[in-house]
Amino acid sequence: MFRQAKWDEPLIFELSRSGRVGYTLPKPIEDVEIRVPEKLKRKSPLNLPELSEPEVVKHYTRLSGMNYGVDSGIYPLGSCTMKYNPKINEEIAGHPGVAYVHPYQDERTIQGALKIMWELEGWLKEITGMDRFTLQPAAGANGEFTGVMIIRAYHLDRGETQRTEMLVPDSAHGTNPASAAMAGFKVIEIPSNENGTVDLEALENAVSERTAGLMLTNPNTLGIFEDEILEIAKIVHKAGGLLYYDGANLNAVLGKIRPGDMGFDIVHLNLHKTFSTPHGGGGPGSGPVGVKDFLKDYLPVPLVGYDEESGRYYLDYNVPKSIGKVKELYGNFAVMVRALTYLKIMGRDGLKEASEIAVLNANYLTQKLKGTRGYELPHKELRKHEVVFSAEPMKKETGVKALDVAKRLLDFGLHAPTIYFPLIVHEALMIEPTETVSREELDAYVEALKRISEEAYSNPELVKSAPHNTAVKRVDDVLAAKRPIITWRMYRELKEKGEVDI
């Protein structure tokens, strides 16, 4: 049985002792005059912890023992594609030519960086069937917002101010309706049919002269491919709307089918999902947005261009109808470097094989777990890259909820799946193993879920009170959301008031 390391580890500020140093700056050869205006000079010393290098290393090593990441084991968060991040990505991203380049340099001195961005765009265009990309968005939701702002700008430019409605399936990512609402659209929910795909009749009834577009993930969040996608595209386009592709699940179809060939006009991708760059706490992310040719004039500025005559790359601000910037400078460049490294190492055939293995792994797990008491498999049996089980029968029969199952999995040294999403599946357990998980790891995961099923029916309190073997037990999720303590200053002030007991 797994048992996680547990250290009574203070915050690094609490370990600080005056006078301790980890690095000593060399003395200047001569006196250096620092020409900083008085009004910009600090009035008090900067409050940083003072520790030696060994103390810093020991502190973070101990913390790492109380953590879990993609290098620890299976991390099957559904619709997150938590695949292994190859270490060569980090090696290339840490190259001085990447790490030390500055965004304000003259573009004549950053030709290598611009070439990387140009080549990455070329790969993404080929993979998706789009005609132009911006690499500026910093993450998936930022990319979504960029995409819906382009839809908005397109319709306004055509004088179609009545197009105020964005259609979103009930199985969509939660950020889809949020992004649409932020862009000023009214969100219209489209229900799923008994197969877990978009209800075409409901879609036909929803489209009108007010329709701006439809935001769709394919495969969807149930892991089911929208096999009526060409008809969906026809319905939306006939109504004058645009079709938007949420690229969260692109890992399932790499090299098999392209969003552009399905009829999508706009696509956002997640380099931190599909293309193996770190995300979550290991970020930052990157959410490039691609468009068909008729929408390229609305992309954020600058774009990267290439002059064949001179052989030089350049930053192109000549985008007549641009929606403007969605992030400072040019995007998260080091993430782009990691993604391009992955693409070049994998190649076209490697990407295709990665998708095949991701789909195989999800279906292998599905077939091994289906029929287990307490877990129900809604909709179709065959999935793409992920599967959603329902723990609703277990909850009704034992009182053990999806949350309890997720917490108990931690006691086996395994990361929990996404839970309670998509909302159309009650007590959802959304599992995406990815292609970088072995058969043995899949077997261990299924066995743990089966063991938890046995415990739920024989000793439900054991599951309800889990986890038991982790460094941190159950936390108060509501309090954490209502009163986050995310800085040393906040923590210190609350502790001085006696409002925290840690």
UniProtKB/Swiss-Prot annotation:
<dbReference type="Pfam" id="PF02347">
    <property type="entry name" value="GDC-P"/>
</dbReference>
<comment type="similarity">
    <text>Belongs to the GcvP family. C-terminal subunit subfamily.</text>
</comment>
<dbReference type="InterPro" id="IPR020581">
    <property type="entry name" value="GDC_P"/>
</dbReference>
<dbReference type="InterPro" id="IPR049315">
    <property type="entry name" value="GDC-P_N"/>
</dbReference>
<dbReference type="GO" id="GO:0030170">
    <property type="term" value="F:pyridoxal phosphate binding"/>
</dbReference>
<protein>
    <recommendedName>
        <fullName>Probable glycine dehydrogenase (decarboxylating) subunit 2</fullName>
        <ecNumber>1.4.4.2</ecNumber>
    </recommendedName>
</protein>
<dbReference type="InterPro" id="IPR015421">
    <property type="entry name" value="PyrdxlP-dep_Trfase_major"/>
</dbReference>
<keyword id="KW-0663">Pyridoxal phosphate</keyword>
<keyword id="KW-0560">Oxidoreductase</keyword>
<dbReference type="InterPro" id="IPR015424">
    <property type="entry name" value="PyrdxlP-dep_Trfase"/>
</dbReference>
<comment type="subunit">
    <text>The glycine cleavage system is composed of four proteins: P, T, L and H. In this organism, the P 'protein' is a heterodimer of two subunits.</text>
</comment>
<dbReference type="Pfam" id="PF21478">
    <property type="entry name" value="GcvP2_C"/>
</dbReference>
<dbReference type="GO" id="GO:0019464">
    <property type="term" value="P:glycine decarboxylation via glycine cleavage system"/>
</dbReference>
<dbReference type="InterPro" id="IPR023012">
    <property type="entry name" value="GcvPB"/>
</dbReference>
<dbReference type="GO" id="GO:0016594">
    <property type="term" value="F:glycine binding"/>
</dbReference>
<dbReference type="GO" id="GO:0005960">
    <property type="term" value="C:glycine cleavage complex"/>
</dbReference>
<dbReference type="InterPro" id="IPR015422">
    <property type="entry name" value="PyrdxlP-dep_Trfase_small"/>
</dbReference>
<comment type="function">
    <text>The glycine cleavage system catalyzes the degradation of glycine. The P protein binds the alpha-amino group of glycine through its pyridoxal phosphate cofactor; CO(2) is released and the remaining methylamine moiety is then transferred to the lipoamide cofactor of the H protein.</text>
</comment>
<dbReference type="GO" id="GO:0005829">
    <property type="term" value="C:cytosol"/>
</dbReference>
<dbReference type="InterPro" id="IPR049316">
    <property type="entry name" value="GDC-P_C"/>
</dbReference>
<dbReference type="GO" id="GO:0004375">
    <property type="term" value="F:glycine dehydrogenase (decarboxylating) activity"/>
</dbReference>
<feature type="modified residue" description="N6-(pyridoxal phosphate)lysine">
    <location>
        <position position="273"/>
    </location>
</feature>
